[in-house]
């Protein structure tokens, strides 16, 4: 281990300390994150730890490292390796982070000593565990002041606490409440007013993007330039943290005569804001040089620090050594940045505050009667940049009749002045005071320095956590005498050592986002490495009021349109609780804690799913109880961001439309404008341009954005859409009228009793229908043109209603209010009656008619941008109802298929595809219908006898199949050929005597019955060697000759549409229904001769059809072979 007094790498040490402090501040705004405890010097001091933090929604907390871990001492100093180890000491959980500070600890400049005889902590506490723990977190520095931070016992519901302001308290519901401590509670205002602000800044090297900070120094500015004019014209004031003038600069272009010019030091809230301002200057450098009256304008990035000696709580102590004092100054600078960050992030603090007065205040009485403490004769600390005094007769929605807007040089001044006003408001006659944000009245495109930054919480939410300096007193040797200064003016200091600590330890310039607590490690390492060994000059500056002009008081008789209340201030009752401090801890981290019952252990289910009731889990969660307010705020932020990114001003409602066709009218332009109701339309036909002003700024932003998605074409010209001049705030009269439905459209209609058919039988219908009528369109235009220009009159064909569209909504409001105005009239009998203005104006033409607001068609939604049938971007979207219809259609289709299958099974079998024809013959008087032309037949005489007796059936071989008469002649002619074929293919007649021909599957009852009948007939013929006589005398079956050439030309059987059938009805089919008469068979033969009405079948059915074809070919081949064998058996002697 190295000696504790040895020098440490300054840059690496500053980087490590910054990571710790960034992590702690990130957890301040994260309600789901807990930070582990690091025990310092055995006193249980609560502070940043090298241990990684864990989240409560993780399955298990991280196990704290021990000295026996290999990487335990990687990030600790040698003197800290064994401190806080649970194996060396077993600290008490309750007293571990509430123990009193050790007597040997050096007092910090930002921490008052805890004693019973001082005036800073007058309330003594007998329990030493509840005294100050010595650590001030950034989030509670200004809130807690110099009071001790106590951690109370969690084992009881009623928490015992100190009575000092800012301490941990609980309300009736058990939730913690923290009251922000006023800095003027413990210090005299007269003493603080004589202590000016002081800053230190170092000019960083140029030529490298790594040296970019949030502070910029503008050199060689003319002495006549006013600071307020620069900020007003070039910078959005709510993005500035501070702005200072530096006297005594020497002009570079003057060699002989030393001419003193000014330098302006501007510090922004974020580094991004500063870079935007810097790039804007470079793009318009000539314009800036002309405005600032400087041809040798120079820009430099600087590292800005606040001197902790200007703190309200700073105490000079002779007991502190020089090194300890330097360390206290270093830490005090960090605490100023931390407290400033806290107020900006949680209170939306700005450089401007508003003071409301109960009565009108004259310009001369502002500093004499109301703000005496800001008079320059008594005040050296708070310097004003501008003052706006407003005295009106009517209050606005946000402000009263009498108020003043004060803008200071930096935000810290505004914070302290606001504390003073809140404490002495009764004596000063002040009703309210709060932060406000200022925006330029008219921001030109050339002077808009922060085009991509919008007002509101977006800038403050990107505020970064300030860096942390070395806390060890030994490291203060690196800074030697850097902070020694001369309070009377500006002193240049030479830093002979590395400034790694100065850049990251003394500065709040390296700010990281609250939303992302991850620092830019690569940039930090690179910058720290580059600055090692580089000597830079540091400048000490006292903010002296003599260097600034006396602020001019601008009086106004109307409300300021560029002043807006801070969003957090508007919802102050919802964000009354500050971030709790010290941070609540989870006691799972301490394995050897003997007093586990004193703390509340978070159950496993709460770790996985945090409960919104537990204050430990929800530390600073901002929840808006009103969803409407939250939605409006979100819409405003989004529209403001889009407008800023598109080059518009915040709240601009005017749209420019160019490239209009000469034959287009104002009516045509309104037909293509969609997205929001309009306030006015200003059409200039000579210039072919038009300016359209919406009621709401988000509507204008939406229309502007939609014009790029869906370009507008009017009369063949594609319209150019841009931003018009800033329209200013919406007048209060119009905003109130819009809430009750006002628009540019006014309708004039007959009463419903005069034209609706449902009242045709009403007695009033006939009377009103005959007496009331609408004037024609020309008369309407002549009468209502007195209120303003008319864009369009839409007159219905049935003449019971019409709509008048004005060019300005104010004209419509005036018309409706005047026509519906009622006055009291007293008749001769003394009765008082109400009389409407419509009965007297325009000759009584509108008496009895209804006149009210209609619907502005410009407020309709652009149908081209929604999923509809009329949209060019229409895409068919399947809805649940569509799926239901599909399922119903599919079910109906399946039912139809089942019905068709059942009908198909009811039809008789078609044997024609197998080469077998079934013909029914009836005996009409005898005669030979068939002749057995089989030469050499043993029983030829018997066949002839049977033919003569009416058995007109010809047998075919030993199969006993009847030959139809139509095929006898063809069979006779081919007999010789068949004999040759059969003799070659068959051996003996006995081999085929017992062969059964299976025509269908035995599993089918109907087809099994058919095949069984045929088999029995065949076996009878074969065994008896004679033809078979069918039992049915009236109907005979003739089977055609088996000609393989003709049978193979038949269409093969089609595969069934499915592999499963329902044959419940087929079993009931009688045997005689299988064979129909000749007429039916002939008709069926014509219908089923070909494949008609093909349909798509699945793959399984295709395979079944293929198998059926193979079976058909095999069957035909077997039938031919069997036929040859049977015929061969009939001639055994041959």
Swiss-Prot record:
Its main location: cytoplasm. It is found in: Cytoplasm. Disruption phenotype: Displays increased sensitivity to some cell wall disrupting agents including sodium dodecyl sulfate (SDS) and calcofluor white (CFW). GO terms for molecular function: mRNA 3'-UTR binding; mRNA binding. Residues 653-726 form the RRM domain. The modification N-acetylserine is found at residue 2. The keyword Cell cycle does not apply. Residues 115-133, 151-164, 471-489 have a biased composition (Low complexity). Keywords: Acetylation, Cytoplasm, Phosphoprotein, RNA-binding. GO terms for cellular component: cytoplasm; cytoplasmic stress granule. The modification Phosphoserine is found at residues 464, 467. GO terms for biological process: 3'-UTR-mediated mRNA stabilization; cellular response to cell wall damage. InterPro entries: Cwc2/Slt11 (IPR039171), mRNA-bd_dom (IPR018885), Nucleotide-bd_a/b_plait_sf (IPR012677), RBD_domain_sf (IPR035979), RNA-binding_domain_put (IPR018835), RRM_dom (IPR000504). Residues 1083-1092 have a biased composition (Basic residues). Induction: Expression down-regulated by cAMP. Residues 1057-1081 have a biased composition (Polar residues). Residues 112-133, 151-173, 464-491, 918-959, 1043-1092 are annotated as: Disordered. RNA-binding protein that associates with mRNAs encoding cell wall proteins. Present with 1540 molecules/cell in log phase SD medium. This is RNA-binding protein NAB6. It comes from Saccharomyces cerevisiae (strain ATCC 204508 / S288c). The gene is NAB6.
């Amino acid at each position: 281990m190295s000696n504790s007094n040895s020098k440490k790498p300054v840059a690496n040490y500053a980087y490590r300390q910054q990571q710790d402090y960034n992590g702690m501040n990130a957890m301040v705004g994260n309600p789901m994150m807990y930070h582990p405890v690091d025990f310092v010097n055995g006193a249980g001091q609560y502070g940043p730890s090298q241990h990684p933090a864990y989240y409560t929604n993780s399955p298990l907390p991280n196990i704290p490292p021990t000295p026996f871990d290999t990487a335990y001492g990687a990030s600790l100093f040698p003197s800290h390796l064994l401190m806080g180890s649970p194996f060396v000491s077993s600290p008490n959980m309750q007293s571990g982070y509430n123990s009193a500070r050790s007597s040997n600890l050096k007092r910090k400049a930002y921490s008052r000593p805890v004693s019973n005889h001082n005036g800073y902590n007058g309330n003594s506490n007998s329990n030493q565990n509840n005294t100050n723990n010595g650590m001030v977190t950034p989030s509670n520095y200004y809130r807690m002041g110099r009071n001790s931070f106590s951690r109370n016992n969690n084992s009881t519901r009623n928490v015992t606490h100190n009575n000092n302001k800012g301490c941990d308290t609980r309300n009736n519901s058990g939730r913690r409440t923290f009251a922000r401590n006023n800095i003027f509670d413990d210090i005299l205002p007269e003493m603080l007013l004589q202590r000016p602000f002081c800053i230190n800044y170092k000019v960083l090297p140029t030529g490298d993007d790594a040296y970019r900070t949030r502070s910029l120094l503008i050199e060689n500015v003319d002495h006549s330039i006013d600071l307020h004019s620069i900020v007003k014209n070039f910078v959005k004031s709510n993005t500035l943290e501070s702005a200072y003038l530096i006297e005594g600069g020497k002009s570079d272009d003057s060699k002989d005569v030393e001419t003193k010019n000014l330098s302006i030091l501007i510090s922004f809230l974020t580094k991004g804001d500063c870079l935007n301002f810097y790039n804007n200057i470079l793009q318009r450098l000539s314009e800036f040089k002309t405005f600032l009256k400087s041809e040798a304008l120079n820009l430099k990035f600087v590292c800005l620090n606040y001197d902790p000696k200007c703190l309200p709580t700073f105490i000079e102590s002779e007991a502190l050594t020089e090194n300890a004092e330097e360390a206290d100054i270093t830490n005090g600078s960090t605490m100023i940045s931390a407290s400033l960050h806290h107020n900006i992030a949680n209170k939306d603090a700005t450089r401007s505050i508003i003071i409301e007065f109960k009565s009108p205040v004259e310009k001369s009485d502002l500093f004499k009667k109301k703000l005496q403490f800001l008079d320059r004769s008594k005040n050296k600390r708070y310097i004003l940049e501008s003052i706006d005094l407003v005295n009106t007769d009517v209050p606005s929605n946000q402000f009263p009749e009498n108020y003043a807007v004060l803008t200071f040089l930096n935000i810290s001044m505004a914070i302290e002045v606001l504390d003073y006003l809140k404490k002495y408001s009764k004596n000063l006659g002040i009703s309210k005071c709060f932060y406000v944000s200022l925006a330029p009245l008219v921001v030109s495109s050339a002077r808009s320095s922060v085009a991509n930054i919008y007002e509101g919480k977006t800038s403050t939410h990107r505020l970064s956590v300030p860096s942390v300096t070395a806390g060890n007193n030994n490291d203060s040797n690196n800074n030697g005498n850097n902070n020694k200064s001369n309070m009377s003016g500006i002193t240049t200091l030479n830093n002979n050592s590395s400034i790694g600590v100065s850049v990251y330890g003394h500065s709040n310039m390296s700010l990281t986002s609250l939303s992302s607590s991850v620092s830019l490690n690569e940039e930090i390492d690179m910058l720290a490495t580059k600055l090692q060994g580089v000597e830079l000059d540091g400048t000490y500056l006292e903010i002296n009021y003599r260097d600034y002009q006396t602020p001019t008081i601008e009086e106004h008789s109307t409300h300021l349109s560029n002043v807006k209340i801070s969003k957090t201030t508007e919802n102050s009752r919802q964000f009354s609780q500050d971030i709790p401090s010290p941070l609540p801890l989870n006691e799972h981290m301490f394995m050897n804690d003997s007093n586990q019952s004193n703390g509340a252990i978070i159950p496993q289910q709460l770790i996985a799913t945090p409960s919104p009731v537990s204050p430990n889990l929800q530390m600073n969660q901002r929840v808006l109880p009103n969803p409407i307010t939250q939605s409006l705020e979100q819409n405003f932020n989004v529209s403001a961001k889009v407008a800023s990114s598109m080059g518009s001003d915040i709240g601009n409602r005017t749209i420019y439309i160019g490239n209009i066709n000469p034959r287009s009218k104002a009516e045509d332009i309104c037909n293509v404008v969609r997205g929001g109701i309009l306030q006015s339309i200003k059409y200039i036909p000579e210039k072919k341009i038009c300016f359209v002003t919406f009621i709401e700024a988000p509507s204008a932003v939406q229309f502007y954005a939609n014009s790029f998605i869906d370009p507008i074409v009017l009369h063949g010209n594609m319209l150019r859409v841009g931003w018009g001049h800033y329209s200013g705030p919406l007048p209060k009269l119009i905003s109130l009228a819009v809430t009750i439905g006002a628009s540019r459209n006014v309708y004039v209609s007959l009463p419903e009793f005069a034209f609706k058919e449902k009242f045709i039988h009403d007695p009033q219908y006939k009377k009103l229908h005959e007496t009331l009528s609408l004037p024609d369109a020309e008369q309407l235009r002549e009468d209502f043109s007195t209120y303003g220009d008319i864009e369009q009159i839409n007159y219905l064909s049935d003449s019971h209603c019409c709509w008048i569209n004005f060019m300005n909504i104010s004209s419509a409001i005036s018309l409706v209010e005047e026509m519906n105005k009622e006055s009291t009239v007293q008749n001769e009998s003394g009765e008082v009656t109400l009389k409407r203005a419509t009965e007297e104006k325009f000759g009584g033409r509108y008496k009895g008619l209804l006149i009210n607001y209609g619907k502005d068609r410009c407020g309709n939604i652009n149908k081209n941008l929604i999923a509809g049938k009329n949209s060019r971007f229409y895409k068919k979207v399947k809805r649940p109802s569509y799926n239901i219809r599909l399922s119903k259609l599919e079910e109906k289709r399946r039912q139809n298929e089942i019905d068709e299958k059942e009908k198909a099974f009811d039809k008789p079998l078609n044997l024609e595809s197998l080469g077998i024809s079934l013909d029914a013959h009836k005996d009409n008087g005898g005669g030979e219908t068939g002749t057995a032309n089989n030469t050499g037949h043993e029983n030829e005489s018997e066949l002839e006898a049977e033919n003569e007796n009416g058995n007109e059936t010809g047998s075919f071989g030993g199969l006993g199949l009847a030959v139809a008469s139509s095929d006898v002649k063809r069979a006779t002619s081919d007999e010789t050929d068949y004999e040759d074929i059969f003799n070659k293919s068959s051996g003996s007649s006995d081999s085929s005597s017992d062969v059964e021909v299976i025509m269908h599957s035995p599993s089918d009852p109907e087809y099994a019955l058919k095949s069984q009948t045929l088999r029995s007939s065949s076996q009878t013929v074969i065994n008896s060697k004679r033809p078979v006589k069918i039992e049915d005398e009236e109907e005979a079956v003739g089977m055609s000759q088996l000609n393989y050439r003709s049978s193979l030309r038949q269409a093969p059987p089609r595969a069934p549409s499915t592999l499963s059938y329902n044959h419940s009805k087929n079993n009931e089919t009688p045997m005689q229904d299988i064979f129909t008469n000749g007429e039916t068979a002939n008709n069926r033969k014509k219908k089923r001769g070909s494949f008609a009405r093909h349909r798509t079948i699945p793959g399984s059915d295709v395979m079944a059809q293929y198998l059926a074809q193979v079976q058909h070919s095999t069957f035909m081949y077997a039938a031919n072979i069997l036929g040859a064998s049977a015929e061969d058996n009939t001639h055994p002697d041959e």
